């Protein structure tokens, strides 16, 4: 994996406390971006964002000089790159396995990430839920 794909970018994630946006922030940081974000309050996912500054409550506007990646829930409040577009950018940055469908995506994606890690791989993953086996 190219760990510097996003080097030099300053990405501010509005809605960083959600399962998807917190995973995007972690992935962006792993790919070399400076990351920071905002959410209305702490969540179980903000605890996973070690080394990422989080602004809680108040105004979700980013500091000057930061690109905004915005969750769907906050798109009406602030302009920025929609999360789906940023996900497409992440997927294009490195080889990816994408799981889609109506049911079982979190379980299936979690099983794939777990299997890759347990067999000696160094996967990154973005999963829309909590997978205890992945830590």
Regions found by a protein language model. Name each.
Residues 1-86:
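N-terminal leader/targeting and accessory segments in enzymes
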Residues 27-30, 62-64, 72, 76-135:
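Phosphate-binding loop of NTP-binding sites
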């Amino acid at each position: 994996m190219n760990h510097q794909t996003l080097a030099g970018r300053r990405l501010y994630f509005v809605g960083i406390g959600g399962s998807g946006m917190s995973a995007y922030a972690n992935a962006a940081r792993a790919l070399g971006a400076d990351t920071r974000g905002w959410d209305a309050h702490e969540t179980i996912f903000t605890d996973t964002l070690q080394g990422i500054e989080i602004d809680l409550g108040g105004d979700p506007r980013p500091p000057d000089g930061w690109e905004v990646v915005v969750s769907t829930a906050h798109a009406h409040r602030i302009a920025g790159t929609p999360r789906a577009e940023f996900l497409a950018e992440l997927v294009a940055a490195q080889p990816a396995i994408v799981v889609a469908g109506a049911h079982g995506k979190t379980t299936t994606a979690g099983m794939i990430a777990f299997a890759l890690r347990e067999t000696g791989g160094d996967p990154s993953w973005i999963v829309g839920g909590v997978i205890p086996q992945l830590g």
